[in-house]
């Protein structure tokens, strides 16, 4: 995850080639700790952009955080 200047959008290092599609919801974690959730608003071959939907209290999404597609199993 790479933060942008816009407060509510982050850039992900994965995109269409990694199966990330428009509208997917991702959970963002740092280590074992949940940081928040985002929804994919744009996806290109190797990058995508996500709009932050929710942040855990007093948390921010930082470079190096891991975004995983939220599925029924890991929700």
Residue ranges of predicted features:
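Surface-exposed, polar/charged interaction patches used for macromolecular assembly or partner binding
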Residues: 1-75
């Amino acid at each position: 995850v790479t933060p942008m200047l816009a407060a509510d959008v982050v850039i992900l290092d994965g995109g269409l080639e990694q199966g990330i599609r428009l509208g997917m919801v991702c959970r963002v974690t740092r280590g074992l700790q949940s940081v928040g959730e985002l929804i994919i608003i744009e996806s290109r071959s190797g990058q995508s952009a996500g709009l932050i939907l929710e942040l855990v209290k007093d948390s921010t999404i930082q470079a190096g955080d891991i975004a995983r597609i939220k599925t029924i199993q890991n929700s």
